Amino acid sequence: VVKGINRHSFSVDGGRATSAAMSRQDALLIKEMNMNAVRSHYAPDEHFLDMCDSLGIVYMDELAGWQNCYDEKVGSKLVKEMVQRDVNHPSIIIWSNGNEGGWNYQLDKLFAQYDKLQKRHVVHPWADFNDLDTHHYPAYLTGVARFTNGYKVFMPTEFMHAMYDQGGGAGLRDFWDRWNTNPLFAGGFIWVFCDEAPKRSDKGGILDSDK
């Protein structure tokens, strides 16, 4: 079962700038939290994939795109670059074509074209696609009804929004225990690994969601 976390490349000191040291720190923390899978909204730094390979963390490698998809001309180039770069990382178990409507169906076939040996599964996060139900943020009752009465493997690629302490994580046990009784449950990816705000020096040492 996938015990996953969504992760953005972010640190309080460097913002969106990354480093191998940051990748190591994040991967070790994810492992310590008993998580075994990671998803991002774009292809990660290779040094993060290296850490996933070495620690036995599986990864969902995603073509960037949210709500609005790439056209075929641009998207085909990006799929080629991403898959050819990452295809030999054993941590990658799934390719993701965009996020929450940001998928171009014409690009789906290209993943297998560059992943000729394994032809790993392609998903559309937030959709019921390719025999995998990945719908996001179900309420408890609707989630139980949808998933436990369904007929496809289900694995929400985002659920339990807990960023900036919005409280989503508080109900994780209730969701997880209920879903885990269903043999079609493949796990899921909670949102999100950490709050995303840079360290600031203009608040007199006060810590809040903006610091």
Feature-to-residue mapping (PLM):
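N-terminal carbohydrate-binding accessory modules
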Residues: 1-32, 50
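Substrate-binding/catalytic cleft of secreted carbohydrate-active enzymes
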Residues: 24-30, 37-211
